[in-house]
Regions:
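A glycine-rich dinucleotide-binding beta-alpha-beta segment and adjacent secondary-structure elements
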Residues: 277-343, 350-352, 370-386, 392-398, ...
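Predominantly flavin-linked oxidoreductase catalytic cores and closely associated redox partners
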Residues: 111-271, 275-286, 290-291
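Beta1/beta-strand and adjacent pyrophosphate-binding region of the FAD-binding site
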Residues: 2-13
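C-terminal auxiliary extensions adjacent to catalytic cores
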Residues: 395-434
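A conserved beta-strand/loop capping segment in the N-terminal third of enzymes
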Residues: 60-106, 110
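N-terminal FAD cofactor-binding segment of flavoenzymes
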Residues: 19-81, 374-378, 382
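Internal hydrophobic alpha-helix adjacent to the cofactor/substrate pocket in enzyme cavities
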Residues: 350-370
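Redox-cofactor binding/interface segments in oxidoreductases and associated redox assembly factors
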Residues: 8, 132-134, 336
């Protein structure tokens, strides 16, 4: 196969991918249409534009995002290096001057040997060249049609409607209990019971909680298939007890009675370290989710690894479609990276762009696949988005998806430090030849 790769999109994932390929002697055609045709989320012509926050998250190794950034530094990420140079004061967070950050990345890519930038919309996926699709959550309609053709339309999602996810260890099992409705199954659900007073306290806070403002491009089809929990509550004070909070079929083993309302949580990962709150798709602001959902008995000290979201977010069903190198299982020349894979957040986009590019470069240079285990945070996120599961929803960096330590450490900060230390040691041993 020709040593030329097409990279689609010069966002965070595409910019990192193009750089890593070019650095390894691979010729790159980088397609970026924003100079002629911007998506609704973008306003400038620079590459790697940060459309929301200017923060790439915590730099602390007690934080999974901080660990992922450190792993990217070890691997030689251009974007993290540029972010470090454009850092602005933000405590432990890596926040950047967003214009300085994007301008420098644009300049590097435009002046780099082996990179040809094509300022056009990419609409045809060739058979004879490797393509890394990093077109982001607002992929153009024409490219979207082509992706649909090669993946099957049922494998594409048009928006995010995701419930919050919490860690199992933060759920108070002195209050909550395992049980499946009507005794069917093996008690897979965690149930958080509410009496009448607790339910109405929760209801009253939920309906007046502050919601996130939707951007214009998110409004059209947002609620067609999924009603947010606060909208259900607003339709009637008892409506939730006939929907997501219905108690029927559940007997509380602590009282041998049916409760007034029950919030259910369902296992979200293979190891049982993460649980999502069933039916709690929401458009509440993150701080409000923490405040209101912590009123649920058993979740008073819940650790949220992901908050609920409802926004336009085109992504593929990566768990069904991609292998561990981020290549399509059914098409040997197509890789995906960035938010379109279901990886969430700036740093995850950079990581998947680098990961796909290293694998493509290794393949073209006759070297072995670069596959990281879930001991590292990058390996954990790739494992999460490629490991088959019944219902796939986007996920960003968090310690809940990384492999557990052999020993049980109660102090959370110490545990996270140990996980980070192990990840860094593992990664350094894994990068020979990378």
């Amino acid at each position: 196969m020709e040593k030329e790769v097409i990279v689609v999109g010069a966002g965070l994932a595409g910019s990192e991918a193009a750089y890593q390929l070019a650095k390894r002697g691979i010729k790159v055609k980088l397609y970026e249409m924003k100079a002629k045709q911007k998506t609704p989320a973008h306003s400038k012509d620079y590459y790697s534009e940060l459309v929301c926050s200017n923060s790439l998250g915590s730099d602390s190794l007690e934080n999974a995002s901080g660990l992922m950034k450190e792993e990217l530094r070890i691997l030689g990420s251009m974007l993290i290096e540029v972010a470090d140079r454009n850092r602005v004061p933000a405590g432990q967070a890596l926040a950047v001057d967003r214009d300085g950050f994007s301008e420098e990345i644009t300049k590097i890519l435009k002046n780099m040997e082996n990179i040809e930038i094509i300022e056009e919309e990419f609409t045809e996926i060739p058979e004879d060249k490797i393509v890394i699709i990093a077109s982001g959550p607002l992929t153009s309609n024409k490219l979207f049609e082509k992706i649909s053709e090669i993946t099957g339309e049922e494998s594409l999602y048009f928006y995010d409607a995701a419930a919050p996810i919490v860690t199992f260890e933060s759920i108070n099992m002195d209050i909550a209990y395992f049980q499946s409705r009507y005794g069917k199954g093996d008690g897979e659900y965690i149930n958080c019971p509410m009496n009448k007073e607790e339910y109405y306290n929760f209801y009253n806070e939920l309906i007046k909680a502050e919601r996130a403002e939707l951007k214009n491009f998110e409004k059209e089809k947002l609620f067609d298939a999924c009603m947010p929990i606060e909208k259900i509550a607003m339709s009637g004070e008892k409506t939730m007890t006939f929907g997501p909070l219905k108690p029927k079929g559940l007997i509380n083993p602590k009282t041998d009675k049916m409760d007034y309302a029950v919030v259910q949580l369902r296992q979200d990962d293979k190891e049982g370290k993460l649980y999502n709150i069933v039916g709690f798709q929401t458009n509440l602001k993150f701080g409000e989710q923490k405040r209101v959902f912590s009123m649920i008995p058993g979740l008073e000290n819940a650790e949220f690894v992901r908050y609920g979201v409802m926004h336009r977010n085109t992504f593929i069903n990566s768990t069904k479609l991609l292998d561990k190198t981020l290549k399509l299982k059914n098409k040997d020349n197509v890789y995906f990276a960035g938010q379109i894979t279901g990886g969430e957040g700036y740093v995850t986009a950079i990581a998947t762009g680098m990961y796909a590019a290293i694998n493509v470069a290794n393949r073209l240079n006759g070297e072995k696949e670069f596959v990281l285990e879930d001991i590292s945070e990058i390996g954990a996120i790739v494992n999460y988005i490629t490991e088959e599961k019944k219902k796939f929803q986007p996920m960003g960096a968090n310690f809940g998806i990384i492999r557990s330590l052999d020993e049980n450490i109660r102090d959370k900060k110490e545990k996270y430090r140990r996980l980070s230390q192990r990840a860094i040691e593992y990664l350094k041993k894994s990068i020979k030849g990378v």
